[in-house]
């Protein structure tokens, strides 16, 4: 299919990256194609986290494959954190010099009673602002406090500025899922090639 038929400019080179991260606690493999079709294959050993990362890939239009083996006998913290770090690194590497991208993206996404607003700047500088309602501590084996840490870890390696505000929500599943969907839509907007030559910064680099 001609990429221009969907309103997307064809990338000059494939925007993709593969990252392997090995520690004494985890083994992580991430393959990311920015200009994909939303095809996802996620296996971290944490079912709810798999579901969240699938939302991220699908709604961003990324092809995303993640395989993580971690010390789940301890808890899910290392698995979740290291996966997010590797994903952020893959995102940064896939974008390269960021020439021709829109750079900024935003989204307002509902999920039943939950509502999330996200704004992103692919600035090259990691910064996170995050707010969400209080909720139950566990969804299955997933600690809901980990979601903020996902974004902290992703932002640290992706080198982006990310604002996330959950404006409404009662159901913990919805409060978490709507964040991943909204971030996905904002990233999809920010990585789009807009036909303007060069890097979108007066500094000449991002």
Swiss-Prot record:
GO cellular component: cytoplasm
Signal sequence residues: none
Molecular-function GO terms, alphabetical: imidazoleglycerol-phosphate dehydratase activity
The entry's keywords: Amino-acid biosynthesis, Cytoplasm, Histidine biosynthesis, Lyase
Pathway involvement of the protein, from the record: Amino-acid biosynthesis; L-histidine biosynthesis; L-histidine from 5-phospho-alpha-D-ribose 1-diphosphate: step 6/9
Start and end residues of each stretch annotated as Disordered: 1-24
Localization: Cytoplasm
Enzymatic reactions: D-erythro-1-(imidazol-4-yl)glycerol 3-phosphate = 3-(imidazol-4-yl)-2-oxopropyl phosphate + H2O
SUPFAM superfamilies cross-referenced by the UniProt entry: Ribosomal protein S5 domain 2-like
Pfam families tied to this protein: IGPD
Gene3D superfamilies: Imidazole glycerol phosphate dehydratase, domain 1
E.C. no: 4.2.1.19
PROSITE patterns assigned: IGP_DEHYDRATASE_1
GO biological process: L-histidine biosynthetic process
PANTHER family: IMIDAZOLEGLYCEROL-PHOSPHATE DEHYDRATASE (PTHR23133:SF2), IMIDAZOLEGLYCEROL-PHOSPHATE DEHYDRATASE HIS7 (PTHR23133)
NCBIfam families, per database record: PRK00951.1-6, PRK00951.2-1, PRK00951.2-4
Family, similarity comment: Belongs to the imidazoleglycerol-phosphate dehydratase family.
HAMAP family: HisB
Protein name: Imidazoleglycerol-phosphate dehydratase
Protein source organism: Acidothermus cellulolyticus (strain ATCC 43068 / DSM 8971 / 11B)
Lineage, broadest ranks: Bacteria, Bacillati, Actinomycetota, Actinomycetes, Acidothermales
Gene name in the database record: hisB
């Amino acid at each position: 299919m001609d990429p221009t038929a969907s309103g997307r400019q064809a990338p000059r080179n494939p925007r993709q990256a593969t990252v392997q991260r090995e520690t004494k606690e985890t083994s992580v493999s991430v393959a990311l194609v920015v200009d994909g079709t939303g095809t996802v294959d996620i296996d971290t050993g944490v079912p709810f986290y798999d579901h969240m990362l699938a939302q991220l890939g699908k709604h961003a239009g990324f092809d995303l494959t993640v395989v993580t083996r971690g010390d789940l006998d301890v808890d899910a913290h290392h698995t979740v954190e290291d996966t997010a770090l590797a994903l952020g690194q893959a995102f940064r590497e896939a974008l390269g010099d960021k020439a021709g991208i829109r750079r900024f993206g935003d989204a307002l996404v509902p999920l039943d009673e939950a509502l999330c607003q996200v704004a992103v700047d692919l600035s090259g500088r990691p910064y996170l602002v995050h707010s969400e309602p209080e909720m139950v501590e566990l969804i299955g084996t997933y600690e809901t406090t980990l979601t903020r840490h996902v974004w902290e870890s992703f932002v640290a390696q992706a080198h982006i500025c990310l604002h996330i505000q959950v404006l409404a929500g009662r159901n913990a599943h919805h409060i978490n899922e709507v964040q991943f969907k909204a971030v996905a839509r904002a990233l999809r907007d920010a990585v789009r090639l807009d036909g303007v030559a060069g890097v979108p910064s007066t500094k000449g680099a991002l």
